[in-house]
Amino acid sequence: YGELARSTRDGYTFAGWWTGENGTGTEITEATVFTGASDRSLYAKWIFDVYTGPAGGLVFYENPNWKVDGWKYLEAAPDGWYDGDADSDGVYSSEDGDPFFQWGASGYVLNPSTTGTGIGTGSSNTANIVNFHDTLWAQYPEKGDYYTNPTEYNNKNDGTVAATVCADYRGGGYSDWFLPSKDELNLMFQILHLNNFSTFESFYWSSSEDDADDAWMQNFYGEGSQRVFWRDFTFAIRPIRAF
């Protein structure tokens, strides 16, 4: 293909030329052979330069629509963010410091729903999850408070709610932390985990509900697969914030 120009962009690392936008399609190098004389469009691939954010975590995403959405960056809590106590079996903390909790009450459809999966939906998902569990007793007064009487709602629930733990986090003095949505969690896998910016060696909950019994989670052990799983199962969590 011959000599290719290099490009620069503030806050990003240039990662080559590709046949599709945003680093999709096929990478084109100086050794690539094309046949034919027609012009071809090439697209630069950019990798966001992760840096330490105002809350002491890792900023891993820049929102291209920040003027409309009202937030520009996503910041993940740092390793060791959780300072709570593990129970006698240690189920609330993993070897890297990320705690394990249930997603929430199993068998109940949240209203408003928390089915948002896209980038930018984690905050509203989290607020809806917290409000639902905080007020569940009002819908079922005979069962009482969910956090103290979880088995009244489902005999497999233990009263922990992943989104509530994230919302209660006050890292860096900020109170706007939330449980990431399905797509926000995948960004953390692609940008932070695969590039060794932080320690993620577990299965992680997202804030994206699937149905009354299941929510989306992601495997950070290797391939990064996402799937729905029972909400009464315990998985690791890592809060993020938008600013």
Predicted ranges, named:
Residues 1-48:
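Secondary-structure capping and domain/repeat boundary segments
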Residues 76, 179-180:
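Short hydrophobic beta-strand that contains or immediately precedes a catalytic carboxylate
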